[in-house]
């Protein structure tokens, strides 16, 4: 049987994928045509960070009070999974290294690197917000 400390964070991360895809579609088809890419990028990044916070909030409620090391490990796992997913999808779709690395630069107001920092920090931050007595 899979431990809840492994299962629930993995399922939570998997729910972030469709949220991120929907966010990308919103940016490409609604925000960018209306506001331009330089405005759409930070709006989209902020919306994705809010969605990730909501998922982390629900995860903290599901797993309850755990040691801070658990929340830090969950954030690290989410970070590694996200970067691996991004590069895996890029490689399978035939993108070059330059194309895959482009989102990791702050160009056209892109805040993807900040989103990745938030992916890593969100479980611990939301654990502290939701359960301030975590050891």
PLM region spans:
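Core segments of alpha-helical transmembrane spans in multipass integral membrane proteins
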Residues: 19-20, 39-61, 78, 114
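Individual transmembrane alpha-helices with interfacial aromatic-anchor signatures
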Residues: 102-119
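Hydrophobic alpha-helical transmembrane segments
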Residues: 6-10, 14, 42-46, 71-76, ...
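Internal alpha-helical transmembrane segments of multi-pass membrane proteins
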Residues: 37-42, 64-80
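Transmembrane alpha-helical segments of integral membrane proteins
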Residues: 55-57, 85-100
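Membrane-water interface at the C-terminal end of transmembrane alpha helices
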Residues: 114-135
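Membrane-interface helix termini and inter-helical loops of multi-pass transporters
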Residues: 26-35, 94-104
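N-terminal signal-anchor transmembrane alpha-helix
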Residues: 1-32
